[in-house]
From Swiss-Prot:
Xref: PANTHER family: CHROMOSOME TRANSMISSION FIDELITY FACTOR 18 (PTHR23389), REPLICATION FACTOR C SUBUNIT 1 (PTHR23389:SF6)
InterPro entries reported in the protein's UniProt record: AAA+_ATPase (IPR003593), ATPase_AAA_core (IPR003959), P-loop_NTPase (IPR027417), Rep_factor-C_lsu (IPR023935), RFC_lid (IPR047854)
Organism: Methanothrix thermoacetophila (strain DSM 6194 / JCM 14653 / NBRC 101360 / PT) (Methanosaeta thermophila)
GO biological process, any: DNA replication
Annotated protein name in UniProt: Replication factor C large subunit
Source taxonomy: Archaea, Methanobacteriati, Methanobacteriota, Stenosarchaea group, Methanomicrobia
């Protein structure tokens, strides 16, 4: 399943938001390549995460009709690999004569065993390049100085919340989702200028819904540096278990929510033995969460949190880098899709509970199937539906049918007839009572006099003259 961040990635530079100056510099550099050799062979696109640096590089290749090759931080970038892959790509055009753009992502993370000699190899590639090269980094000054001197920096800045909100509304329209302006603006404001994070937050809140309200938004006022996606990065790619745990301290997600995120994305990052050990840690964490629910002892959260973060990080000895397309829990999507059905179910359970003098939870767990069986019976169905005051959607849910079926519609109509008959009977009884109450005083006096005379005659003792 393609994430929305990938699905709505810009296809050309006009789609890059909030960084018009950077886009202009990119276009000018590309046109210089088209006319011959530019002043610099390589650009460094730098700025905060999620502001469109990689998207701009890919959009440039698309707009200029260039081929491209991308080497990101998830790949091993030793001197030998860079020499064998990026080297030839930067010196030779395609068979059709098109230029080839070489993109190296996370250039400020060239360190460690896997990237040994990578910076020096990239510098040699740039010096010998006859094709355009782009380096992408978050921190400009984390790139080694010889590399910086061989390139020209192009800065990307954080994107304004209004600009982000405008794009989020367009995405909602494309997905057929009606969105409250406050909900979209809340996501945009909480993103801290990170467009990718905002789109991911929108997807987590809105996927499976038809109407997005403010209360549906999963994000809340929290440190934007501690978004769920950055926490997942720390868990799966952090230096150690402690950093994985500490990344959750400012996260506004309970362990019961966080475990669903990790469970969904664990198979994306880990494989084979690591995956099995990772799920074992999640299983143990879930045991502690169960104890929290049963005992209401929230101090046990700390053990669950460590197992699902530090424990999951500890099962892997690899140091992973680069961008991973994390996805929101599929469980939440299913809950969103069944929200209306659950609402109808709970409404029916409340009516049954009130009629039977039991709790709603008991009615929901024990009586729904029983009432459904009564509704399916021709003898009792209409009477039960009328007694409980069920609407057509509740009848359909309890009988396991669609509201549009003739059987459900007839049952609902019969129940309505019973209800109307009872209402008419109640009105008749009420009218009779009112008639008695508004009877004329002289009529009452004559009636009472007549009744009194009859009573006196009945109570009078018989005499001899009666025989």
């Amino acid at each position: 399943m393609t994430s929305w961040a990938e699905k709505y990635r810009p296809k050309n530079l006009d789609g890059i938001l909030g960084n018009a100056k950077a886009v202009s510099e990119l276009r000018a550099w590309a046109m210089a390549w088209e006319k011959g050799r530019p002043e610099v062979k390589c650009l460094i696109l730098y700025g905060p995460p999620g502001v469109g640096k990689t998207s701009a590089a890919l959009a440039l290749a698309s707009e200029m009709d260039w081929d491209y090759i991308e080497l990101n931080a998830s790949d091993q970038r030793t001197a030998e690999i860079i020499k064998s892959i990026a080297g030839p790509a930067s010196q030779v055009s395609t068979f059709s004569g098109r230029r080839r753009l070489v993109i190296l992502d996370e250039a400020d993370n060239l360190h460690g065993t896997y990237d040994r000699g990578g910076a020096a190899a990239i510098l040699r590639v740039i010096k010998n390049a006859t094709q355009p090269v782009i380096l992408i980094a978050n921190e400009y000054y984390n790139i080694e100085k010889p590399l910086r001197d061989a390139c020209r920096g192009v800065q990307f800045r954080s994107i304004r919340a209004q600009t982000i909100a405008s794009l989020l509304r367009e995405i909602c329209r494309s997905e057929g989702i009606e969105c409250e302006p406050e909900a979209v603006m809340h996501i945009a404001a909480m993103s801290g200028g990170d467009l990718r994070s905002a789109i991911n937050d929108l997807e987590a809140a809105a996927r499976g819904l038809k109407h997005l309200r403010l209360e549906d938004v999963a994000t809340s006022e929290r440190d934007v540096k501690a978004s769920i996606f950055r926490v997942l990065d720390s868990i799966f790619k952090g230096e150690d278990s402690r950093s994985a745990l500490e990344a959750t301290y400012q996260l506004d997600e309970s362990p019961e929510d966080l475990i669903h995120w990790i469970d969904e994305n664990l198979p994306i990052v880990y494989k084979d033995r690591e995956l099995a050990k990772g799920f074992e840690c999640l299983s143990r964490a879930d045991i502690f969460l169960g104890r929290v629910r049963r005992r209401q002892n929230y101090t046990l959260w700390r053990y669950a949190a460590f197992l699902m973060t530090g424990g999951v990080r500890a099962v892997s000895s690899k140091v992973r880098r680069g961008y991973t397309q994390f996805r929101p829990p599929s469980l939440w999507k299913r809950l969103g899709q069944t929200r209306k059905a659950r609402s109808v179910r709970d409404s029916a359970a409340r009516k049954i509970a009130a009629h039977c003098h039991v709790s709603t939870s008991y009615a929901r767990s024990e009586l729904l199937n029983f009432v459904g069986a009564l509704l399916r019976s021709k003898k009792t169905g209409a009477a039960v539906a009328a007694s409980l005051g069920l609407n057509i959607e509740e009848i359909a849910l309890l009988t396991g049918s669609s509201p549009t079926t003739k059987k459900v519609q007839k049952l609902f109509e019969d129940a309505q007839k019973i209800i109307e008959a009872e209402q008419i009977a109640m009105i008749d009884r009420g009218l009779k009572i009112v008639d008695r109450e508004i009877e004329k005083p002289e009529d009452k006096a004559m009636k009472y006099a007549s009744v009194s005379k009859e009573i006196v005659q009945e109570k009078r003792q018989r005499s001899l003259f009666d025989f």
